[in-house]
Amino acid sequence: MKEAIAILTGGGPAPGMNTVVGSVAKTFLRKGYRVIGLHEGYTGLFNPSPRTVDIDYPMADGIFNQGGSFLQMSRFKPKDSDFENNFNLKFFTDNNIKLLVTVGGDDTASTANRIAKFLEAKKYPIANIHVPKTIDNDLPLPKGTPTFGYESAKDKGAVIARAVYVDARTSGNWFVLAAMGRSAGHLAFGIGEACHYPMIVIPEMFDKTEITVEKIVNLVISSIIKRKIMGMDYGAAVISEGVFHALSDEEIRKSGIHFTYDEHGHPELGKVSKAHIFNEMIEKKVKELGIKVKSRPVELGYEIRCQTTIAYDLTYCSELGIGVHKLFAEGKTGCMVYVDSEGNVSPLYLKDLQDPTTGKIPPRLVDIKSDKFSSVVETILNAITPADYEAAKQYVPNPEEYDFHKILNWK
């Protein structure tokens, strides 16, 4: 029987999913393997009738540059009991599968490791290689290397953000944007930097003080006042949704928003418009202060996850897909495929990235100590400093409370 590989996609979509799947398929087909695509992520491996598709070369070529994921995705994460009671070992043995390729985030990678260990215990060892994916750019790849999909999502987000900024200048309004990023602020920061937004708020900025609703609002108010002093009655702020994940339960209650929570205890941010929440809080504060300004909310959410992949990610994802075969041919397993800026392929072992205490892969955060971040704060952001206190008194009696550095407790 011809040897086969199985490939699945887990978690949420990101631009480049189909490029990875298509590139993996093309490479292995040329080497004589059968390529089996699994729909619904890991769900199919834990029931007797998985939804599968044999991917041939024309199909791989057809999906290569399409947005979304040809293989339907799922966030299903099996319990330990599922392995003993529901795992479809017959799928692997009947199809002579030698490699499981998983495309997703850290949860998808961890489950792949569990499956490989389970199959080894059942005397049917297979290789597993993971392709790291997230528009949040928060997987701990070597410095300067993005996760695939991030650059495309940033590009599409910036298209919207640029148009919004032009609208702000044209109409004399402010806009409050919210960008995805549960654990890290890479997407919000990247979009804000690209579009020269006068205020960017990400969770990493609160390294010396607790994140509160008041501080988030005051940062935007600081920018509004500073711009007025500069003679500009318009502007835009982009805020990472990750600030909500860092808020205490008490602070979330203060926001007045009633969240539902997922099984892991995280507020289900996808069910509400974060931009609307932020905008309402800001509108309330400017009204209390008597500052004349209109603001409008814009959510940078699900619509950027399935956008057409830009050239950067088309190339990068192709290299990742081809790199999977290189690592497999070298006998590598239990690893993520990594491609450096020169196109060199190497493995990153999940065991080396995991937190030794929790076993989880920690997120890569925005480096607020970097020259890049500092230059954005110093040259692009507009916010109150001590030099503005006197001029700011025409808008607020206590301008020091809206001092950018004091809000964040930065020296």
Where are these regions (language model features)?
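N-terminal phosphate-binding or glycine-rich loops at protein starts, especially the Walker A/P-loop
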Residues: M1-S49
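Gly-rich Lys/Arg/Thr-decorated short loops/hinges at beta-loop-alpha junctions or inter-strand turns
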Residues: A4-I7, I63-R75, K133-T145, T170-G172, ...
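Short, ordered loop/turn segments at secondary-structure junctions
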Residues: G10-G12, Y33, L38-T43, R75-F76, ...
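Short glycine/serine/threonine-rich phosphate/pyrophosphate-binding segments
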Residues: A14-V24, L45-F46, D82-N86, D106-R114, ...
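Accessory alpha-helical/coil subdomains and C-terminal extensions
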Residues: V35, F91, L99-G104, S110-P125, ...
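Glycine-rich oxoanion-binding loops at beta->alpha junctions
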Residues: F46-K98, T108, I135, T145-D155, ...
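C-terminal non-catalytic interaction/assembly regions of soluble proteins
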Residues: E251-K411
